[in-house]
Amino acid sequence: MRPQFLKRYVIFFILLLGCLVFAYAQTADSVIVNQLRKEGITFSCNNSVTLLTSGQEKFDDLFKAIRQARSSIHLEYFNFRNDSIANLLFNLLEEKAQEGVEVRALFDGFGNDSNNRPLRRKQIQDIRRRGIEIYEFDPIRFPFVNHIFHRDHRKIVVIDGQIAYTGGMNVADYYIKGTRVVGTWNDMHCRLEGNEVNSLQRIFLRMWNKTTHQNIQGAQYYRGGLSDGHFIGLKPDPRNPAGHKMVGIINREPHTSNTIIRRFYTDAINGAKDSIKLINPYLTLNATLKRALRRAVKRGVKVEIMVSTHSDIPLTPDCVFYNVHQLMRHGVRVWMYTPGFHHTKVIMVDGRFCTVGSANLNARSLNFDYEENAVIIDRCTTAQLSHLFDRDKAQSFLLTQASWNRFRSPWKKFVGWFAHLLAPFL
């Protein structure tokens, strides 16, 4: 071989090796940030994130913040259940409205009507008379089929444009008390301070103006940065110093950003190198996500999933059980949470980043509804979630073929197989 050809081969080999080393050296968090930025998602690095790991923590923290509001309180929920917690909330909002604070609340029409204790028309009118602007997004009207999809499933609160809350919890007392059907109700929420509060405010005002045909806008609603200190007594961010977390908000809107959340989950799983921990209540999954999880196992990634043995709705859990059994057979470690219902929607990847938000891993959240998740690029917050995952493993059983046969009768296995055929509609 001529020397010049040998030299070219050596140079080519070195360049190829360098590309491979660079590709491997890219961490999962840098990959996901770059991919989301290509999708138009912005990230800021001056955020504080405080996890609220129970209904009691969430509502205690939220009510303390509302009591200290000075200018505006914006709430967007799938539903306000007509119970003791909602009554406390509306009484508190009435007090703030009488102080001159602007109070706006949105709820979803389907979310309200499908609730076993919905807000009735007279109650909504009474809430308005108390100074609270409250509106229903897309009320259910004939023909009802027109209103099945594109529901507002988000859970957002923004106070004074300075702090925001988001996660998996609506407004209901069962987040604290549990229910007779499922037992205790586990869920996750978080409080944000920093620039990404502005992102959540934009999401709220866009939906508010769409629903009410008003045109609410102005710099007074967008503060940015950490709060000015008038919110005291709230649960602190454990990171010291606080206010240096990278966060981006992924917002799914029908016809505008249809694929953003399913792309995030797919890219996060595909980019994992060491570990994936996933909790989601309605894990009906699509073929792409199932394939991504199986491939992660083949790459040597430790994949752990947690789902509940109890659920609040029919048929969907049968599909979930079928799916996790199939994943278990491909090497995924599946933990079956037994004390109650785990409604948490989180993923942790490589100990480097995580997400907290409203999106389930079912067809409704990934293909149809309005959803929103906070993507948190921070080892501290991810470690907190990972610790909670490991804590709940102690109250779960590991799915094996033997435990599967004890858990599901032949008839229930058939129901699960049938339910998984309906996954595109669940």
Model-derived segments and their meaning:
Residues 2-10:
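Bacterial N-terminal signal peptides that target proteins for export
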Residues 11-20:
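Bacterial N-terminal signal peptides
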Residues 21-426:
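Charged, low-complexity intrinsically disordered terminal segments
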